[in-house]
């Protein structure tokens, strides 16, 4: 079957830059979905997206649908006709369903059958509907109307190109009649641009100063920004989201180096970077030591004959913003950091839980408690806790919310606070996302854990649990943050005790009954989710959770040991044996003796098992106490043979009550040795 290239380009006013790439991807996805539904084959398809256009190019698209055969089976012949040969309602109903007379139905087989070959339709007649459906399904939160038209789209449409091979696909979509006239760069080439063929689309527009390929523009910007940064003896900060946004703002990118006064470098560089990136869409430059250089890169959308005018204009625009940051920084430093707590006495953290200052007091107390137990400095943790929210009341954070914690660090350093105290003011918010950086200091870790536990306990304590996708206080992230800090920083904290301490600090503000257990269950459920994401079998998690270790670090060490144990050849048999032992002991009606009486071991197999368990117990106990759980389980794996022999040769429930009870005691010792690490009966 013959095939042609197909191109559709919808021209618009400037599209939302943050959504441009996703709109292009969705446009392509919708068209591919429509082509597949129509049975139209093609070789490849890709999208193009620029500020004023969305386009899709489909290579080697079939010019016509393939013919298809409809084959429908109807009722059996004996049900289709009565004894006189007259058609029944079943036969007539089947013919009606097929849309034909009964005479056109095949009666040669055991059932009525309708066979029809339907000729494929030309692709050119199907493409307008496919394109329109794709545009209607684009993920646009709010569509707009323009002029006196009823059509709706994300932005007013300006032109439409639809070519199938060399021919225009005649149609009208979103108030635009299809043609082959596109438009060039708004300033360099504002006239119409004739698209000679779908394959020539990119080059035709390139000649009109438009790079329609989003990926090409993105790569060009990234490369040129890196080159210019190197020329300035620096490196550029290029967040992927900023690069995407800048790519979506320009059709013909021209990166240029600009500068600002060095006096602004006295302001925290994070504030300068924030305002230049978020407000001006600039790429900031750092020196080899990670310090901000007094230069930045802007990406112009025009190749100017006087680029110095563009540079000068951007420098004038950024100066007031940097001046504002400088002013806020100087104003905030005029008073001690702790004095900002007075403002926080009137700022509500949560209506039922009190003010932000009260939260800082609780965090201070809990951070000191935690620091003592993880080897940190309780006094410094307490100090960091009481200062932890002060910067929320500063001018700097009021203008730049992203500076919370960071501003606190600079103001604490300016005020002569200990380095770990200052760092903790920023580290309290760590990790700021999945896989993000963790606190570098014990003081920071203590404050971060305290802050998150205080939020968890408080919000749970007033019954505002997260439901489904709703988690306004980010409790899931808080729980995962606590777990990451304690596990990845190797901090051995009794979380049960810490949560109870957090509950006590709230007093009568929360309903304390069962609160600690509720919070702990939530946190350890997050740990289960973390392991699932890492590919750990849920049975491994459950085998450890059954023992309810109170320290997340201890919990993780056990999980890693069980993971290793499962790889051993003895694991499956020992897991099954433990499950059998668990069932036997659960059904015991008699009290199980605490110790094994060697004189009551009668059979050779039980004597061998008794000796093996006793030897293993003496070796495993110190290993488990030292938390060398992997070595402990490896040692217990040697019990497989005597365990298998015991169950093969020995009957546990014998008539002799003393012997029976002694065998229960032996099995309890066996199970207890494994329970020092995990309940491996759950691995079956």
From Swiss-Prot:
It catalyses: tRNA(Gly) + glycine + ATP = glycyl-tRNA(Gly) + AMP + diphosphate. Its EC number is 6.1.1.14. SUPFAM superfamilies: HD-domain/PDEase-like (SSF109604). GO terms for molecular function: arginine-tRNA ligase activity; ATP binding; glycine-tRNA ligase activity. Its main location: cytoplasm. Disulfide bonds: none annotated. One of its GO terms (biological process) is arginyl-tRNA aminoacylation. Coiled coil: none annotated. Keywords: Aminoacyl-tRNA synthetase, ATP-binding, Cytoplasm, Ligase, Nucleotide-binding, Protein biosynthesis. One of its GO terms (cellular component) is cytosol. It is found in: Cytoplasm. InterPro entries: DALR_anticod-bd (IPR008909), Gly-tRNA-synth_bsu (IPR015944), Gly-tRNA-synth_heterodimer (IPR006194). Pfam families: DALR_1, tRNA_synt_2f. HAMAP family: Gly_tRNA_synth_beta. Belongs to the class-II aminoacyl-tRNA synthetase family. PANTHER family: GLYCINE--TRNA LIGASE, CHLOROPLASTIC_MITOCHONDRIAL 2, GLYCYL-TRNA SYNTHETASE. Tetramer of two alpha and two beta subunits. This is Glycine--tRNA ligase beta subunit. It comes from Pseudomonas aeruginosa (strain ATCC 15692 / DSM 22644 / CIP 104116 / JCM 14847 / LMG 12228 / 1C / PRS 101 / PAO1).
